Amino acid sequence: MKKCAVIYSGGKDSHLALLEAASSGAKIACLVSFDGGAGHAEYFNDYRKPELVAAHAGLLGVPAVILKTGPDFRVKALARNVALMARAAREACGADTLVSGVARCRCGGKIDSWRKAAARAGFGLDAPVIGFDLIYAVRLCLELGVRALITGVEAKKVDRRWLGRELDGEFLAYLSAEKKAGRTVDGSDLQTLVLESPAFAGRVIPLKLVPGRIAGQELLKVEKFRVVRGRRRAGAWNRG
């Protein structure tokens, strides 16, 4: 049985990858994520979310492995970064496979480079949602009961009115209409935060959202949130 460390951001794609891996029979051993500190936005084009990743891990009943980037960190140093994640995941939770939430790989053979880098570190690498386009991913969230907040939009591609709203049937209809009009919205044009999931033993409630902008993205930073526990036992979903 595979013991998986999910490369996790708290968004819909990494969460769907986790659910897909678990449904295939894998054991989800931990979540792994980089924390870029003061340079996080420069590195990852997003706000840092270590507390949210840790909150998700608690609701899932698995450990969170948060790797702080050092002064020599480089986003494009793929082999080194994959090796860092693999080593940390192996030590923290005994994982042997990384799970990536990359969807509709837009970088040619980049996923093959990820797999080769993982193999050099003695790991497998699975990308269970790589064939998902944005419309399918949103539809799957709705079908599974995954609630996700839209926390970022590419200003030139996605109408700003969706910022701060949850993925829903109306947003799905908007994506379909854009596609029919020849203005396809890609997964990279959207950032989300999962609030509730069938795998969570509760939910995340944002309390303070602060608007901002990074490059061409309009973003909402979750400055305050709380976790509400439900009746489900954390980890009950993880039967691999």
What kind of feature is each model-predicted range?
Residues 1-240:
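Nucleotide-activated chemistry modules centered on ATP-dependent adenylation/adenylyltransferase
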